[in-house]
């Protein structure tokens, strides 16, 4: 599926090309100009009610241009951070104006969207994805996300297995990210990096995925009540064993 939006992660790219058939001597391209606009209308070329975007870095991201005698291409790289905090995505127009060898010119405009990074949410031990369904529904109802931008991944069938098994054998996070990227692409969003939220064991699995499998596709990680340094009950055990041994060896007079 062709994407027209990209997630704000500083890496995802889309290309727009104005092209003519090879051998078309009337339209030999010598150079091009690129501009960006906010516009909500039917004809950007004749309508003066458009806003030129000057803050390229934060709204558009970055871009490079390339042209041959029959093509003019702009490659866009998404901004590193999401510019709008209240919408699921925003859009702008990129306008390519190609100049021809014969002195003429032609322009094309393409709508491009910038989306929030997709979010994968992992539940904890002895739990299921149903725990975070109300949270997902709240975020979607707020208008800040669309449903495809959030995946509440369920791994209840394996979450009593070891961290290693869930990371490497069952590939909980890896498969979840694949599902999330497909969900995004199905609604026209190209993506490279993703936000991860994990509760308890879910946070550990996301951290282990980054440490042991792949850390090139993570935008940010947020963990909730995750025992990264082990469960606190582990600190109680040595003292508990000491008391048990002490009382077991104590003289009956002290019991």
Where do the model's predicted regions map?
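Active-site catalytic motif of lipid deacylating hydrolases and related acyltransferases
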Residues: 115-194, 239
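Gly/Ala-rich beta-loop-alpha elbow adjacent to hydrolase catalytic centers
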Residues: 197-202, 206, 225
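Short, hydrophobic alpha-helix immediately C-terminal to the catalytic nucleophile
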Residues: 133, 206-211
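Extracytoplasmic/secreted proteins and extracellular or luminal domains
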Residues: 187-190, 201-205, 213-214
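Helical cap/lid subdomain of alpha/beta-hydrolase-fold lipid enzymes
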Residues: 174, 178, 191, 210-255
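Short, well-structured secondary-structure segments
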Residues: 149-152, 206, 229
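Beta-strand-enriched, solvent-exposed domains that form extended recognition/catalytic surfaces
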Residues: 1-114
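Hydrophobic beta-strand residues of extracellular immunoglobulin-like
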Residues: 14-16, 120, 204
């Amino acid at each position: 599926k062709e994407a027209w939006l990209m997630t704000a992660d500083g890496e995802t790219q889309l290309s727009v090309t104005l092209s003519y058939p090879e051998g078309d001597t009337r339209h030999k391209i010598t150079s091009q100009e690129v501009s960006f606009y906010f516009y909500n209308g039917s004809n950007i070329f004749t309508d003066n009610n458009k806003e030129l975007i000057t803050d390229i870095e934060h709204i558009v991201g970055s871009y490079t241009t390339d042209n041959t005698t029959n093509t003019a291409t702009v490659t866009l790289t998404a901004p590193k951070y999401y510019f709008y905090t209240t919408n699921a995505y925003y859009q702008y127009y990129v306008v390519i104006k190609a100049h021809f060898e014969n002195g003429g010119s032609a322009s094309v405009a393409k709508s491009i969207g910038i989306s929030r990074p997709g979010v994968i949410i992992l539940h904890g031990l002895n739990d299921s994805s149903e725990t975070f369904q109300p949270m997902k529904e709240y975020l979607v109802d707020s208008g800040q996300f669309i449903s495809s931008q959030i995946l509440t991944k369920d791994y209840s069938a394996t979450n009593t297995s070891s961290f290693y098994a869930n990371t490497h054998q069952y590939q909980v996070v890896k498969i979840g990210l694949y599902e999330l990227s497909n969900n995004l692409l199905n609604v026209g969003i190209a993506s490279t990096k993703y936000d991860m939220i994990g509760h308890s064991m879910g946070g550990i699995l996301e951290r282990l995925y980054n440490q042991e499998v792949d850390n090139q596709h993570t935008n940010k990680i947020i963990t909730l009540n995750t025992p990264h340094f082990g469960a606190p009950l582990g600190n109680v055990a040595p003292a508990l064993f000491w008391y048990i041994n002490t009382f077991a060896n104590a003289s009956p007079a002290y019991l």
